[in-house]
Amino acid sequence: MLIEDDTGFVLHARAYRETSLLVEVLSAQHGRIGVLARGVSTAKGQVLRAALQPLQWIRFSALQRGELAQLRGAEALDAAPRLVGQAMLAGFYLSELTLRLAPRQDPLPELYLAYGEARARLGVGAGLAWTLRRFERELLTSLGLGFELDSASDGQPIDPAARYELDPQEGAQRLLSERAGERRAAATGSALLALAADEEPDAADLASLRLPMRRVLAHHLGPRGLKSWEMLEQLAPKR
C-alpha cells in the first residue's frame, strides 16, 4: 500500500543497523505505523534525520509492506517544541502512552487531533497536569475505552462534594469509605465534572484526578508500566 502525503507526529525513533532509523509515527490517515528510514545517518540524510525526531510534525510518503513501511520521503511541517525539564518528560509521556495503547494501522483521527493539541499546549507552557489529564481522557475515548464522567456507574449524577474511584470497565463509583488514605486516592466529583466539561478545575481537584486516571490506564497497559511514570512520579508534587 502506498502512503502519499500523509501527516503525522513522530512518537519514537531508534537507530537500526548502521545508517537507518526505525520510527513510530501517529499519522492522520493511517493511525500508528512503523516506518523504516534508510540512509539517514549519512551526510546526505541529515536533513531527513532532523525531521524524524520525537514530537516532530511531518508530512511523509511511504510504501507499506507488512508490519513496517519503507519511508520514501519526509519533511518537517513546523519547528518541534523545545521542551525542557517537566515539559520534556510530559512530552515523552504523551508519546509513550500513545505508542503502548494505540494499535498499528488503525486510523484514529480523534487521537491524532488530541496529540497535536497536547503537543501545542506543551510548546506554549500550558499547565502540565491539565494537559495530561485532557489527553488521557481523549486517548481512552478514541480507543473506545472511555466512560461517562458526569454520571456514576449506577446512573446517578456525579455529586461535586463526593469522591469517586474510577473502575476501568464500569466508570465512576462513589467512594463510601471515610478512610483518609482512600479518599486521597479518589477523584473529587468536582474534578470529574470539570474533566467532562473540559474546564480546568482548581489545583486540589485537578490533583485528585492523577491516581484514578493512572489506575485506569494501568489496567489497559497490563503488568508493564511506563518508563515516563517512573520519572514523572518524582515530579508529581510540583505538577
UniProtKB/Swiss-Prot annotation:
Q: Which Gene Ontology cellular-component terms appear in the entry?
A: bacterial nucleoid
Signal peptide from the UniProt entry = none
Q: Where in the chain are disulfide-linked cysteines found?
A: none
Q: Which is a Pfam family this sequence falls into?
A: RecO_C
Presence of keyword Nuclease: no
* Family named by the database record: Belongs to the RecO family.
Protein name per UniProt: DNA repair protein RecO
Q: Which organism is it from?
A: Stenotrophomonas maltophilia (strain R551-3)
- Which gene does this sequence derive from? recO
